[in-house]
Curated annotation (Swiss-Prot):
<feature type="binding site">
    <location>
        <position position="284"/>
    </location>
    <ligand>
        <name>2-oxoglutarate</name>
    </ligand>
</feature>
<feature type="binding site">
    <location>
        <position position="274"/>
    </location>
    <ligand>
        <name>Fe cation</name>
    </ligand>
</feature>
<dbReference type="InterPro" id="IPR027443">
    <property type="entry name" value="IPNS-like_sf"/>
</dbReference>
<keyword id="KW-0223">Dioxygenase</keyword>
<comment type="function">
    <text>Catalyzes the 3-beta-hydroxylation of 2S-flavanones to 2R,3R-dihydroflavonols which are intermediates in the biosynthesis of flavonols, anthocyanidins, catechins and proanthocyanidins in plants.</text>
</comment>
<feature type="binding site">
    <location>
        <position position="218"/>
    </location>
    <ligand>
        <name>Fe cation</name>
    </ligand>
</feature>
<comment type="pathway">
    <text>Secondary metabolite biosynthesis; flavonoid biosynthesis.</text>
</comment>
<dbReference type="GO" id="GO:0046872">
    <property type="term" value="F:metal ion binding"/>
</dbReference>
<dbReference type="Pfam" id="PF03171">
    <property type="entry name" value="2OG-FeII_Oxy"/>
</dbReference>
<feature type="domain" description="Fe2OG dioxygenase">
    <location>
        <begin position="189"/>
        <end position="293"/>
    </location>
</feature>
<keyword id="KW-0847">Vitamin C</keyword>
<dbReference type="InterPro" id="IPR005123">
    <property type="entry name" value="Oxoglu/Fe-dep_dioxygenase_dom"/>
</dbReference>
<comment type="similarity">
    <text>Belongs to the iron/ascorbate-dependent oxidoreductase family.</text>
</comment>
<dbReference type="InterPro" id="IPR026992">
    <property type="entry name" value="DIOX_N"/>
</dbReference>
<dbReference type="GO" id="GO:0045486">
    <property type="term" value="F:flavanone 3-dioxygenase activity"/>
</dbReference>
<dbReference type="GO" id="GO:0031418">
    <property type="term" value="F:L-ascorbic acid binding"/>
</dbReference>
<keyword id="KW-0284">Flavonoid biosynthesis</keyword>
Length: 357
């Protein structure tokens, strides 16, 4: 079997392991863009008297409505963003054996994966990824960072640092919005983890049957996503009834709030419900930077507003929260698979005239 997806991209029919059930298939095209997700300029965010209040209001409104927004004028240098994107594309263009040198299977911390790093997935995602842990710095395992293309480690280090700064700045705004000290959300993460996932979605022969990344919410605090101009990121705020495709904005970061951010705000801020779709015209690249709390950090609302109840019964660690989330996901997948098998079994047992009726 081919070791990478890039090799399957040229086939005319989609391999059955990527085919999703009908209820999970894309409802909206990858390039049918919506401008419902706000694009917010951060120019002047540090002027305490000036623009800061207005920017804070826009961010809070976006978090209450969607849990997702885009930021421009964010202070991350455009040439750094261009370098990071170029190196990522160059990596995925390498021959399969070069990419597979960094194969992550067998419990390695970081590296190259086809489809997904989760065990027990019934249907595969149409993507290749390279992932590594960048914070805390002591957790960096440079042997798992690609050594090709040249310059990857140096550019990634700078990119990681700049995005850590941007994430903390956004968390300060959300802390203030909750009526807390501005360091509150960052402190709640204890020693903030950062994981970078570079997603590559090759051209797909039958994109209407599959997903690049299945529907989910991110488990962590906040995610900063850099995407190219192709389009494919989709979001829903009514539990999947209607989906919109996020309009790519040159040089912007898409900001998603995760489950941890949702719980800390006592549900006031939404955890973005999203997925990625693919297409048959061109490949797509996105770079997700996940800002997560330390595994031992406590997950519990930082503030419960008057007249409200806490949305969690008890404080738990982030490690436990993550474990429960994965357990639920696998259980849902298992039940779905069972129901499907049962349905197929019943269909097979029907007499032919009934099936054709």
């Amino acid at each position: 079997a081919p070791g990478t997806l890039t090799e399957l991209a040229g086939e005319s029919k989609l391999n059955s392991k990527f085919v999703r059930d009908e209820d999970e298939r894309p409802k909206v095209a990858y390039n049918e863009f919506s401008d419902e997700i706000p694009v917010i300029s951060l120019a002047g965010i540090d002027d305490v008297d000036g623009k800061r209040g207005e920017i804070c209001r826009e961010i809070v409104e976006a978090c209450e409505n969607w849990g997702i927004f885009q930021v421009v004028d964010h202070g991350v240098d455009t040439s750094l963003v261009a370098d990071m994107t170029r190196l990522a594309r160059d990596f995925f263009a390498l021959p399969p054996e070069e990419k597979l040198r960094f194969d992550m299977s067998g419990g390695k911390k970081g590296g190259f994966i086809v489809s997904s790093h989760l065990q027990g997935e019934a249907v595969q995602d149409w993507r290749e990824i390279v992932t590594y842990f960048s914070y805390p710095v002591r957790n960096r395992d440079y042997s798992r960072w690609p050594d090709k293309p040249q310059g990857w480690a140096k550019v990634t280090e700078e990119y990681s640092e700049k995005l850590m700064g941007l994430a903390c700045k956004l968390l300060e705004v959300l802390s203030e919005a909750m009526g807390l000290e501005k360091e509150s959300l960052t402190n709640a993460c204890v020693d903030m983890d950062q994981k970078i996932v570079v997603n590559y979605y090759p051209k797909c022969p039958q994109p209407d049957l599959t997903l690049g990344l299945k529907r989910h919410t991110d488990p962590g605090t906040i995610t900063l996503l850099l995407q190219d101009q192709v389009g494919g990121l989709q979001a829903t705020r009514d539990d999947g009834n209607t989906w919109i495709t996020v309009q790519p904005v040159e040089g912007a970061f898409v900001v998603n709030l995760g489950d941890h951010g949702h719980f800390l705000s006592n549900g006031r801020f939404k955890n973005a419900d999203h997925q990625a779709v693919v297409n048959s015209n061109s490949s797509r690249l996105s770079i997700a930077t996940f800002q997560n709390p330390a595994p031992e950090a406590t997950v519990y609302p930082l503030k419960v507003r008057e007249g409200e109840k806490a949305i969690m019964e008890e404080p738990i660690t982030f490690a436990e929260m993550y474990k429960r989330k994965m357990g639920r996901d696998l259980e849902l997948a298992r039940l779905k698979k069972l129901a499907k098998e049962e349905h197929n079994h019943k269909e097979a047992a029907k007499p032919l005239d009934q099936i054709l009726a």
